[in-house]
Amino acid sequence: MTKMEQVYGGSLYDLAKEEGLTEQIYSELQQVIAIFDGAPDYWRFLQTLSIAKDERCKALDEALGGRVQPYLLNFLKILCENGTMGGLKGCAQEYRRRYNEDHDIVEVRATTAVEMNPQLQEALKAKLQTLLGKTVELTFKVDASCMGGVLLELPGKQMDGTVKHRLESVAAALKNAAV
């Protein structure tokens, strides 16, 4: 994430917080990104600096005017006018980071060798919420190279309980013992 994305995303969050709109803008920001992801030609158009700023901002007005919070629309226009629309996802990341921080939410990614059944997913989420004392947003990834167990990735921390990690630890210990 660039410094510009941190500053812009943080500024949008500060404004939303001041106006009591953090949840609405968070939701709409995610929806706008999903729309742009689903319309790559439109997304490229908004980022094309050879197209006049007024034309790109007008396209934003036509597509989103009255459908999203005016502060969010103005934020998107500022990105468009400054030629920094490509940083929207980074701005959204910073907004989400600040939102999560203020709402005691922690994002955790769990990687397993096979897909976890829904009961195990809920049990893991409940256990993490108890341990961390925060609301947990848990995402899951399947990676057969884990061989078993679970790898948990939290902000600034990784807890590796995979079979692959254990085998690597045993191999390293054997290698050091043989020397």
Describe these PLM feature segments:
Residues 1-179:
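Elongated, mostly alpha-helical coiled-coil "stalk/stator" tethers of large membrane protein machines
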